[in-house]
Amino acid sequence: MTEEILELYQFEACPFCSKVRQKFTELGVDFIARSVDPNDRTRVENVSGQTGVPVLVDPNTDRVMPESDDIVEYLEENYG
């Protein structure tokens, strides 16, 4: 079975988002960066029920996860 690509809802300048992007790179895991407009967070709210970033969407496990530390731990446990 082919794995689907993970999605990361994020801001480029967000240090918490940067931490998650670095973990993706460290693990060699492909992902799609979905940049969120800081003035219109409707898209991330529709996905996660909240307006904060980063938010990980893993279509392989149907997980939607906020919080950078939780995302990093999840990536290490499931894709490391």
Predicted regions and their residues:
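GST-like domain detector, emphasizing the conserved glutathione-binding G-site
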Residues: 2-12, 18-80
